C-alpha cells in the first residue's frame, strides 16, 4: 500500500505594509507527531519558535515560498499570496523528492497546482498540517522583519512586524517609504505622495 502525502499550506503577511508575503507548506510524519500545533496567531513568539524547530526536525518535509513587495505591487496581494503558496509547495516537493498527493490550503481559494487541492476556511484551526505551515510561514516572515528592522530601525518593524499601526504610519509620514514597502498599499502610496509634494 502506497503512502499518501498530504501537505498543509498557509501564509503570513498579507496585511502588512512592508515585506514579502510568505507561505509555508508542511507534510507531517504520522510516526513522529508534534504536540501543540495550533494556529500561529494564537501562540506566543517563543512557543512559535519552539514549534518551528520541532517542525524542522520531525516533519516529513516542509517548504517555504514568498512573493516580494515588487511582485505584490505588480500582481496584487491575492495573486502574490497564491504565487507564494505555489512556491512553498514546489520547495516542499523538491525536499520530499516528489509532489505531495494533495494540498490542504488555509482559506477559501487554492493556487493553480499540478496536484489535488482543497481550500479549508479556518483550516489553521482544523488541520495540524495547516497549523504547522502557519507556524513555518509566520516564523520565517517575523525573522525577515527582524532583519529588516536592523537595516531600518526608524520604522520600528521589530515592534509591529510591518502591520499598519499608528507608530508605523507616523514613521511613514516622517521618513517616507523604504525599498521594502508595498507601493500598491494605500497608506504607503499616501506617504509617498505627501513626501513628493
UniProtKB/Swiss-Prot annotation:
SUPFAM superfamilies: Ribonuclease H-like. GO terms for cellular component: cytoplasm; ribonuclease H2 complex. Keywords: Cytoplasm, Endonuclease, Hydrolase, Manganese, Metal-binding, Nuclease. It catalyses: Endonucleolytic cleavage to 5'-phosphomonoester. Residues 4-197 form the RNase H type-2 domain. Gene3D superfamilies: Ribonuclease H-like superfamily/Ribonuclease H. It comes from the Bacteria. InterPro entries: RNase_HII, RNase_HII/HIII, RNase_HII/HIII_dom, RNaseH-like_sf, RNaseH_sf. Its EC number is 3.1.26.4. The keyword Flavoprotein does not apply. Endonuclease that specifically degrades the RNA of RNA-DNA hybrids. Belongs to the RNase HII family. This is Ribonuclease HII. The gene is rnhB.
